[in-house]
Amino acid sequence: MNGISHRSVCLILSVFFALLGPSGVPVARAQSTADEIQRRLNKLEAEIVKGEDVSAILRLQRAYGYYVDKGMWEDLADLFAEDAVGNYPNGVYIGKDSIRKHFFMNVGGGKVGDIGLGDNRLYNHMNLQPVIHIGPDGRTAKGRWRAMAMLGRYGERSFASWADGVYEITYIKDRGVWKIQKLDYHSGFGASYATGWIVPEKRTASRASRTLAHPADKQRQMACEGFPEACIAPFHYDNPGTKTGGPIWTSSDAPSSKDEPVSGGTIDIQQRVNNLARRAMMLHDEQEIENLQRIYGYYFDRRMWDQVADLFAEGGTIEIGLRGVYAGRDRIRKSLDLLGPEGLRNGQLDDHIQLQQIVSVAPDGQTARARAREFSMAGAYEGRGTWSEGIYENTYVKENGVWEIKSLHFFPTFITDYDKGWGKDARPAPTASSEFPPDGKPTETYEIYPNFHIPAFHYRNPVTGNYPQYPKGEGRPMDEAIQAAMASVKSGGGKAMVSETKENTEAILAEAERQIQRVKDYYEIQNLENAYGYYLDKNLWNDIADLFAEDASMELAQRGVYIGRERVRGFLTNVFGKEGPVEGRLSNHVHMQPVIHVSPDGQTAKIRSRMMQQLNLGGRASMGASIYENEAVKEDGVWKYKTVHTYNTWTAGYEGGWAKNPGKYLPGQSEKYPPDAPPTLIFEMYPTVYKIPFHYRNPASGK
């Protein structure tokens, strides 16, 4: 009977029949036949494998961005299949070896084997906004990602620039490991930091025409090289609000080969149920930790220090830059006052965007580690603005079923004055306070940009399973830091993830089925959110409207509320202009940091997310930021928006930025196409600070 012994079937049936309710109706119908039990287990495992596939692809592509950041070209090349194709602006590279040479020689500017960037160079490469779909065969997948890059050189021959683009990537599962099969990069824009994203007076030479140390294997045929041209990078997916584009994977009852029969050709059902429950829980835990880290960022934005401190375990620690280590929740709370008093005040901006998490949960599900990125915009009105970016290497612990931060360690990459930019200004990392000294000295000493430093990776290469290949000289982490980071994610010493009592087999199985469905829901809602941003980029109003349920609503800024999908469609087309991208206009809407909570019944969800805008609407470069508090509903198995509510936080002209040139005007209700209801909240943007509602309580304290 497909690897399950007759004795096991009899045992499980007897357990299930023993679980009759008061009315005599079975708690589950799986006890009717051994085939039904087998079907449920096979379907559960097939769903878990697909969830693990999505998790692995997210990990793979996020690692890609971290490796590019630090010039870890060997680890980067290892993410590609042997026969992979890299379709970059300067040409097409065929085969892993050619792609590897491209990274070392063309991107790194050195010879093969030269790992690392060296001092005075910035090459930040943020991989954001994933839309992932697993192919029906389970062996291929496709993903859309946004790349946002900050490039520069400090000192002699200094420069600073921005770059943005879209990856459309095909992945392949090779002997159980996901790799990049084909990567197509579509340029969005490239811009000097000094001017921002303005229409250039004359186009620079195409990157394809430049002399390369490692020539491309084939010339790229590009339909568009990005702004100021009007083009759309092809979408690999149908609209996620439709039946064909909504599912992130196709469900099936096909058994997996992951659980091989034990000796004697049989698998104990209880063992299999427990193994599957453990795997489903680990996927759920990954998402819980992603939510936790993103919530930390939202609290930090508003200097909600009491809430930030409550996210830490009682014996937790915090280490920001070279300030030293503060231990214990009370000491953590007091240390945060060094960054300013509780609560953001008018005239202050302190955005801390949490990005690109790679989470590793311990086998027992009681501890975890994660690498994450923070991109920050801070400053004071009519004062000074700053950009900064850095890396977290954190640990987490599950206490009483709730994830908390055990240790938070933030490594700044760079801190720079807004007016000067990273080509001309580089600030040192903050050091220990004499006013409120830390409990311990910094666990690692290093210098930030313009010096080169790599925070040690806690995870191995997602493809090879090998330790990272660090440079031997400049930028290499301390040996002690490498050893500490690469230590296995150890058991927290708590209770086992699932009970092994046979009497609760049905409860464990039902909970695992529920959890993997919530995992799938989370991923599909993430696709919905990120697709919304891509459609906004290109003024695809009809695609945006098709993401909404029939009775949904939209409220943007102070424009009022539009109720019903067709009213949303009419609002977009009548107020914002014609459908599609426009020559000479840039309208980037970078969607980030979703905190997703699915209801217990799996039919509704609430989402907090963030958007950064990069705009050129008439020759003037500008930017802005918003917070969304959205709701989603599942209709016929497809997630759609129930409400989209945008809270604008700030806008600014690129020249001067948020500190010296904030845009205070908020558009009101349209006379041409009036809303169905007035705005639900009247507010003013930065430099005014107003309260944006949270749909959730603190996940650790419940406050």
Language-model features: locations:
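N-terminal secretory signal peptides that target proteins for export/translocation
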Residues: M1-H6
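Bacterial N-terminal signal peptides
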Residues: C10-S23
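Sec/Tat signal peptide C-region and signal peptidase I cleavage site
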Residues: G24-A30
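Short, low-complexity N-terminal intrinsically disordered segments enriched in polar/charged residues
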Residues: Q31-Y66, K70, D78, G246-Y298, ...
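A solvent-exposed, acidic/Ser-Thr-rich amphipathic alpha-helical stretch
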Residues: W73-M148, W305-S376, W541-Q613
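Short, surface-exposed coil-to-beta transition loops
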Residues: H125-N127, W162-Y167, H352-Q354, W387-Y392, ...
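Short beta-strand edge/turn micro-motifs at domain boundaries
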Residues: T140-K142, D164-R203, T367-R369, E389-A426, ...
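A hydrophobic membrane-anchoring alpha-helix module
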Residues: G188-G190, W197-S263, D425-S499, W658-K703
